[in-house]
């Protein structure tokens, strides 16, 4: 399932998309060029493909842009979120291209929906990261004393892995009176030093010279390498060795074995004796030539030292030096051309592959791939084919790209999968063949919902956890295949609207891993539960859910807190103990609490310090401080005790409480030191008096205003009472009003009009309405509304209206 998930790109691509692909490929003949300096760190920015392709970010993500290149080595990576093309690793131009210039890495940019691709190339720019190196740190040059000024002596060159300006620029030699050095350039562009005699030598005056040869490259700053040149002045040897021909051209097959004889060169010297003895050697050979060829110093035979590879080097230019015993030498050049053989099988690079494909989608693009062969000529020409009994069609695209399409609609009920073999054959002799097998699956409809392995999950998390902690996982499986079986997980809205689920946990949508987003506190939240949903990616999508319970485990993260005696830094509280107290007398009790639970909240007490050790004791489980023995006159009157309160957690947390005990002979006039905070209390009492006076003044003004308003309202009522139908009874009532004093939670006095209905024959008062309007914020209450008829103390029935 994971393998198919990596290969899934798109499920549908119609023939119209393929036609668009062909058109776009035909118009992309000119590759897009980018450049990067070698040794640039991996993940460095190269370009933004969305801008280069003229795509918006949303369209760029939708079209599934990818970068591919020949072979398995991919030097670039594409950030799908930002469309940035980044280096996949640090590039070394010398490892990638050697002395080839420019160093170009070719790749392709593929787009889908519709299919498009663009050729592109990345040029790796050389930096001066290599110094010139002489393969021979010491050179011996024998110069005849008869050599005239101006005679030149070629020296062995230095090697520099850099190219262009960073390669060797010139040579210099240490100051001397006889020689100078010139920088010469060979046909292949390499530079070598040539020692030129400026002044005739005299062996009798100076038999040898020691000079330092320095090679400088053209970098900034330049790098250099040195070698020692030993010049031996010899007697006259007037003939140098001469080769039979100055230039040799040979051809050799790339599959020639090691020690194979490439060619034999020959030189002669007309001198006699030691001056006529000739030895052969490679001259100014590069590191690659020295590793590939060797020359017999006596016979001049050039043989192979390692296997040739036409794909790396098509030819070699080898310089051979013949030197006699007198120090004179002759040179010749051997051009060795490598003949290609069919030693590389074709390679297939898969760029896009879609499986499974829906059974009801004809002419769907199944795969896009490219073929290549490292050989040349007929050995590099390729043919591509598939089996004939399959409902697929293989079409050639631009360059060496091929597209595999469904030729007819597929029927899953008749066949659920197809094994397709792509056969790639070159035209060499003998022919080499490569096979690529693919399994194309036909997808089914989505008819199975994901099923959790459990209907409910219980997870345990210890409080004070680190954020993003993995607390557990849920898992669901789907019996479908392909995308219909790909399950994504999500958190469903909690049933408790007050539960901040989004800030408590998160879920990995791909694997169902649950993470705590923040540190949990057992004292604030002991447990919570939520539902998790699992949905497949079918169309339409099917889903299921499971219940997850999270139980927070308590940790010992709260130290005991002493409630009594107070330890807030104020004046200490002094406990009085009579000197006549018996052993076991209860002095006081240390009261402490712990915010944790369980054994983390089990508190124990012990006496940590005391003015008189052994005089007092503390009960370990309840914190009671009692006398341990009889008090004596020698015991100090003031005692200071420090009690340690410790919980039972691991590791335990603790707090201390300080007690002040005063031993007195009696309680009639105990000596109590005045608190140090007494002056501050006096200031607080003075402030309280001012506040009370101000509040009383404001209340008096408000009450006076209310009474004035009531008086005006009563005057208006007295005029209107003369035309009413109610008679005014005689009695202790002031005027025609009755004061009904509230006895409940209301503190105001309410006045009602009391009317006795004439001729009714009943002793009923009707309280029509209150004279004063309702004061906002008070109500008469539902009790009075439900029972409006009641009896008063005078035997009348009162009726509220």
From Swiss-Prot:
Cytoplasmic face residues: 711-801
Record-level GO BP terms: cell adhesion; homophilic cell adhesion via plasma membrane adhesion molecules; nervous system development
Topology, Extracellular side: 30-691
Listed Pfam families: Cadherin, Cadherin_2, Cadherin_C_2
Molecular function GO terms recorded: calcium ion binding; identical protein binding
InterPro entries for this protein: Cadherin-like_dom (IPR002126), Cadherin-like_sf (IPR015919), Cadherin_C (IPR032455), Cadherin_CS (IPR020894), Cadherin_N (IPR013164), Protocadherin/Cadherin-CA (IPR050174)
Transmembrane segments: 692-710
Cystine pairs: 97-103
Signal peptide span: 1-29
Membrane association type: Single-pass type I membrane protein
Record keyword Ribosomal protein present: no
Gene Ontology cellular component terms for the protein in this record: plasma membrane
Subunit structure: Forms homodimers in trans (molecules expressed by two different cells). Forms promiscuous heterodimers in cis (at the plasma membrane of the same cell) with other protocadherins.
Record-given protein name: Protocadherin beta-8
Organism: Homo sapiens (Human)
Protein encoded by which gene: PCDHB8
